[in-house]
Design a protein with these regions (language model features):
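Selective transmembrane alpha-helices of multi-pass membrane proteins
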Residues: 73-103, 159-160, 164-169, 182-196
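Core segments of transmembrane alpha-helices
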Residues: 85, 128-138, 195-196
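Alpha-helical transmembrane segments of integral membrane proteins, especially early/N-terminal helices
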Residues: 42-52, 113-128
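Juxtamembrane transmembrane-helix termini in multi-pass membrane transport proteins
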Residues: 2-78, 138-156, 160
């Protein structure tokens, strides 16, 4: 029992629940994942999942070891917010321009984006969304409190990053199922336009 108390803060159940509820609410990362999973299935979306999880992990790391610096540099935070807004507008414009297309339900898609492109798109989506930064700052500081140890913060951060990755991979896997693909093939462009 002592090892659990050493690794997990007393507020960990509340932290885990709050984090999971936040994952359930759709945001830019969710809609990007859905669009990719519909078009490219699991193989064309794994890098996106990894990038989104990495971006979340970086914000958690910032919240743990260096958020005070960013709070003391309002210009830097404003620049991040503006870059985030521009990036989200760009993704939205791509989704708004989506056109009806027939999905390749059998075999691999020839137009699947390279893994590196998926990774950077997911990382950009996650890092340039200022809501992620504010969410993790609020979660790590207010919920865990000042008495939590660095080890407990690190374990909580690793937990949340892992949950983001597992959730995103599960979502993409479910959307990539052939039965779901058949249902979504006629409306993929509408989903993308709505997301945009």
């Amino acid at each position: 029992m002592d090892i659990l108390a050493t690794l997990f803060p007393s507020a960990f159940p509340a932290l885990a629940l709050s984090h999971f509820v936040a994952l359930l609410s759709p945001g830019p990362d969710f809609f990007l994942l859905v669009g990719y999973a519909i078009r490219y299935r699991l193989r064309g979306s794994v890098g996106l999942c990894l990038g989104i999880a990495a971006g979340n992990g970086l914000y958690i790391l910032l919240a743990i070891i260096g958020w005070g610096i960013l709070r003391q540099a309002p210009l830097l935070f404003t620049v991040i917010e503006l870059l985030g807004a521009a990036y989200l507008l760009w993704i939205g414009s791509l989704l708004l321009r989506s056109r009806p297309a027939t999905l390749a339900l059998h075999g691999a898609s020839a137009s699947r984006p390279p893994l590196v492109k998926q990774l950077f798109l997911g990382l950009g989506s996650s890092l340039l969304n200022p809501k992620n930064a504010l969410f993790y700052l609020a979660l790590m500081t207010s919920l865990l409190g000042p008495n939590v140890t660095l080890v407990q913060q690190a374990v909580s951060g690793a937990w949340m990053t892992s949950v983001v990755l597992i959730w995103d991979l599960l979502l993409v896997t479910l959307i990539a199922l052939p039965s779901v693909q058949r249902r979504l093939s006629a409306v993929v462009w509408r989903v993308e336009r709505t997301a945009g």
